[in-house]
Amino acid sequence: MIIKRTKDIKTFNSLNKIYHITAQLDNINRKKNKKIRIKGSTVAKTLFTGMFFREKSINQIMEKTHKRKLYQKLFKNEAIPKMHGFVDGIKDLNVNDIEKININTIKKAKENKMYRNGTIDGLLVVGLDGTETFGSYKKKWNNCYNKKIKNKKIINGEEQIIEEEYHEQVSVFARIVGKRPGILLGYEKVTSKGNKGKQEYEPNVGINLIKKIKKAYGIGIDVIVGDAIYLGKKFVKEVKEEGYHGVIRLKGNNKNLIEDAEGIFKKQKAKQYNYKKKTIQYWSDIFEYYDTEVKVVKYSETDDKGRKQEIYVVSTDVNMNEKTINKIIHARWDIENNGFHELKHQWNMNHCYIAEENAIDVIMQMIMLSYNLWELYIYGHLHNFENMGITKIGYIEEIMMIFIVNKGKAWYSSSA
């Protein structure tokens, strides 16, 4: 049974007019491997459709295209390649062309004042975090992240500890947090560099990502929030130089700062307020941190079941309200709980579609594009999704069913 969501599907169809997705996909080029005869735009549109439908493998995309003829309906005037041609085409796509579509989509959302009121207390907050997307003991690709893992193996009937090399795709992502749509602004890979496999330092990759974001989107972002791994001299300096404020968790990797703060806080009387079924006490003061002033806040939080936790937070904005800092540091979990969880388990970011560096980046950019479009549609353009009584994935599947029945005419009118 197909539910008629006439108003919703009309809004969904308007996305292509707002963000000009298929027109931009038509302009995607290949890197000109002469052995491949299929157009870059055809490969790109087919791959985008597969990612938009959240397909779990290249095999599924090909099966729904050629055997079940579902996607073929969307491209009546184009010859879609079979498996080997499609894979070779993905490897040859220009990833910069796809990245530009992502940037243009986010700029359009900004132009449409999607975040006019910020995401937390009037501030637009971006969370930074690194994660492993997928890994393999067998497959290896250029610039993957390598590490040694000790595993138990049965050899000649005896259990032995064997050290094996593990290859994984590790990236630092930037995502808008505090309020949905929680769109992804970009990512940077953490790689192994040098002949000895020396690993890059995640905060350095985060710095590169911040610079990339500033170059792509300019002004508009107010705060970068991150875990304790990012709290260091270089990161704090770069965040401020790019014109942002940083709100960063403080843990044992900055032991001296914690000890200095604790010494001061013992002499202070705690301030207290209630927020979201929690009683929150806090102490705060301004400290010198690598030639710059920062505000350090200690929170002692007790929930309605009596459970307690203490957290220390650093803010590079010494004038930021302690209640706002608390909201921001808790919003940091959005990128993991909503972002990474959905991307890995619902958008299949944890699956290695093709173990080749350019293909990995092409597919990641396509996953970003499809994820962001759904976020913008559901939480930005619908306005009433929270009152529908349906899960996000259940709703997406309903809309896509209608989309296929209508042969995607509003999106693929030139080929339908």
Please report, for each region that a protein language model flagged, where it lies by residue.
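An internal, acidic/charged active-site-proximal segment
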Residues: 192-299
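Structural motif
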Residues: 32-43, 159-164, 304, 353-364
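Short amphipathic alpha-helical "interface-anchor" segments enriched in bulky aromatics
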Residues: 14-16, 66, 321-354
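Electropositive, glycine- and tryptophan-enriched low-complexity nucleic-acid-binding patches
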Residues: 150-220
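Gly/serine-rich nucleotide phosphate-binding loop at the start of the catalytic core
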Residues: 1-81, 87
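A short, flexible helix-boundary coil/loop motif
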Residues: 4-7, 22-26, 63-66, 270-288, ...
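Short, conserved catalytic/metal-binding motifs centered on acidic residues
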Residues: 46, 61, 82, 122-136, ...
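Active-site-proximal, Lys/Arg-enriched surface segment
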Residues: 87-179
